[in-house]
Amino acid sequence: MRRLLPLFGLLWAASAAHADVRLHPLFADHAVLQRDRDIKVFGWADSGEKVTVSLGSAMVSMTTPASGKWQVSLTKRSASITPASLVVQGKNRVERTDILIGDVWLCSGQSNMEWGLGGCDDPDAIRSSGNPLIRHFGVEMLFARAPQETVKGSWAVAGPSTSGGFSAVGYYFARKVVKETGVPIGLLRSSVGGTNIECWMRQETLLDTPVLKPFADRMRTSLAQYQIDLRAWHKAVDAWVKAEAKRVAGGMDVSFPPEQPKFPFGEQAFNPRCVTLHNGMIAPLGNFQVAGVLWYQGENNAGNAFEGNQYIEKQRAMITDWRTWFGTPNMPFYSVQLAGWQKQSTDAAGGDGWSEFRDAQRRSLAIPFTGMASAVDIGDVDDIHPKNKQDVGERMALWALRDVYGRKDTVVSGPLLKGVQSGKPGTLVLAFDHAGGGLMAGKMAGRGKFEPLPATAIGGFVIAGDDRVWHRATAAVDGDWIVLSAPGVVAPKFVRYGYRMNPLDANLYNKAGLPASPFRTDPQ
């Protein structure tokens, strides 16, 4: 056997020297490639191998460098619904068919982004989902210690046999955009349930962002301890091998070896799993051009008020990180404001972790080229995974339609607090952006079903004076203004709206049927 080992080595070396030219897995049959930008195509081949890439009539060649990694750029193209073939010719020939040019949207976050259309109790959506202009690539989950270059997954065309596995939020987003614009949409889903935002950033970002320092310190401490434990384990294994040799010689059974230490940020190390998902599921996508990001995450970061307040800086750090990674400084980033969950608190003040978190999400709109689709009104008391993903996806699509697709008259958001001032004695007057034709009371009565309510029914507001004793307020609509008062508050100064984990009484909308974001005006 020992004589055969060198031969196996030579055979492996010979096969490696004549490895097939390969494309990155993102370039597969049915792929959507980003329009209006130079198209980067990349993969692997032998050092020195000439690689020629063609897409339709466009063709470009290069010689593979010593690293074995090649990348070419094809001239940018407009959106096209005509399928094309992508061909790579080296020592072998690789062809990918049914390629469209359109917009690729990265769908990331936790389980509510991962949630498939098949789990939404919407069989009509699946039955009618056949559309060659909507495609989906699901990135296989991978926690990685170091940045990876490749992923596992495949492209699928929307249809009754495939759409059940699509990200539901992504699918409803794409369905609306395609209907309005005719531009092919590729959904690049890279999401994992139960994950913190810290999982999705590069290590450099984690280390350089002050608010993330506790996670960075925990990461360094855990990795240092892991190295100590690993060295001790190697010594224990050496001792075990020697001891077992004697046991075997004496005719005894072999015992179990010492247990290997677990890597501290692997799949089973549930919290916080820093960096590892960026390494495994974002880093490999970096050269693949995308139009923007759809982000539904936060349940794992909303556990308490302190975490909620910090989220704006964490999200700012991650957005900057991703825009740098994808080489697009103004990349659109649209997030979902957390849906309501569990029973409504009877405490007038509210102020739990989820309410603080939603307010941080609202304030994150100050980050340029971002948008927020509120889902606060379409939650589920009993399920952290509400089935109504249609309104979530379509509300995200509104931002894209206005900011990416030029539909400038689109109402993209529900009312957002603009300012507050004292009115007549005993009242506060609130002004709102995104009034959308006027403020009103309303409710959602199912997917895509908005029902107006009498103006006198507006709820969800509480006010307080300097004493910070909160009282439920009566709200009156005055055009794009809300006037608040409460019998127990002579000199109101502060207001909160929908400031609970599940604010079922918060029902302020604009006439476009979009809900107001929860907020607070008292200092935190």
Regions of interest found by a model, annotated:
Residues 13-14:
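N-terminal signal peptide c-region/cleavage motif recognized by signal peptidases
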Residues 1-4:
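Positively charged n-region of N-terminal signal peptides that target proteins for export
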